[in-house]
A protein has these predicted regions:
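Specific alpha-helical transmembrane segments that line the substrate/conduction pathway
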Residues: 31-42, 70, 74, 78-111, ...
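C-terminal-most transmembrane helix of multi-pass membrane proteins
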Residues: 1-4, 37, 127, 200-202, ...
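Hydrophobic transmembrane alpha-helices of multi-pass small-molecule transport proteins
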Residues: 44, 64, 70, 112-131, ...
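Membrane-interface interhelical linkers
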Residues: 1-8, 39-66, 106-117, 133-140, ...
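Transmembrane alpha-helices of multi-pass small-molecule transport proteins
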Residues: 25-72, 76, 99-103, 150-157, ...
Length: 294
């Protein structure tokens, strides 16, 4: 159940790459993010606002840390999305499947096997291929990579905090921290204005309710049952959905080298997490067929 819910979350994130890219072309970036997380905060407050009192100071601090990491990741990702393509953004974002165990090693002394280092190498090669084929800009791709690092840290910290606190309350504080941070930036830049048009409002409602409030509530709930490494593995499916929706809805054309880079990144993801193949086989119901011998 947790795995299926996370797959649906990645599908929502994949399609919102296209919506967000269209929206921030006509509406200021940080104003968009402030309104998005205001909607997410309001949605969660309606169903669980009273639960925040159960967190105490440690829980409030934990939610704030998660919110700051999440906000940093989303802000950098959206800024990168303004400068590069939907497909590139989606595939580079998938690198957190290898960055998550790497940061786990540095912060929590989690052991890594040789396959993880090989996966990281493949992912870096794939990123280089993507950045060198005139798909968006290298600067935009680097912004997305920086956002991926923040998201990897957020996944690790959710693993530590999720078992300790109420899921709705912790997620609500996360969303509120993001809202306050983006509101301050939007005000400082003079970007805050009333959203207009269905392109902007549609993106705000979908990302606020489904891609933020519901998605991160599901993450906190699921990380009581699944490890950070497995969460990151499932989240890598976002790269597949982003590529598909970017191709179908946004007309992205990566070319053979760009798609080759995407394939190398995905190969790195699978190599870094050996259970990926088995997990994907279970998801699609695939079973190998043994050929009869002569």
């Amino acid at each position: 159940m947790a795995l299926l819910a996370l797959i649906l979350v990645t599908a929502v994130w994949g399609v919102t790459f296209v919506q967000v890219k269209d929206a921030v072309e006509i509406y200021p970036l940080f104003a968009f993010l402030a309104v998005r997380y205001a909607i997410a905060t309001g949605a969660l407050a309606l169903v669980g606002g009273r639960r925040v009192g159960t967190l105490g100071r440690p829980g409030l601090a934990a939610g704030t840390v998660l919110g700051l990491l999440l906000g940093l990741g989303i802000g950098l990702q959206t800024a990168g999305l303004e400068r590069t393509t939907v497909s590139s953004t989606g595939f580079i974002t998938g690198l957190y499947v290898v960055l998550t165990p790497l940061f786990g090693l540095v912060l929590f002394r989690t052991r890594l096997g040789l396959e993880v280092w090989l996966g990281v190498t493949l992912a870096v090669v794939g990123l280089a291929m993507l950045s060198g084929v005139h798909v968006g800009s290298p600067g935009g791709n680097l912004l997305v990579l920086a956002s991926t690092s923040a998201q990897a840290l957020q996944i690790l910290m959710v693993e530590r905090y999720a078992p300790r606190y109420d899921a709705i309350a912790l997620t609500l504080v996360q969303m509120a921290a993001c809202f306050v941070g983006f509101l301050v930036i939007a005000l400082a830049l003079g970007e805050l204005e009333v959203p207009r048009g269905w392109t902007v409002w549609g993106a705000l409602l979908v990302t606020g309710v489904f891609a933020s409030a519901l998605a991160y509530l599901i993450q906190v709930w699921a990380q009581r049952r699944l490890s950070a490494a497995r969460i990151a593995l499932v989240f890598s499916l976002e790269t597949v959905f982003a590529g598909l929706f970017g191709y179908w809805l946004s007309g992205d054309r990566l070319g053979w080298l760009g798609w080759g880079g995407c394939a190398v990144i995905l190969a790195g993801i699978v190599v870094a997490e050996p259970s990926a193949a088995a997990t994907l086989r279970r998801l699609v119901g695939w079973r190998p067929t043994l050929l009869p011998s002569d």
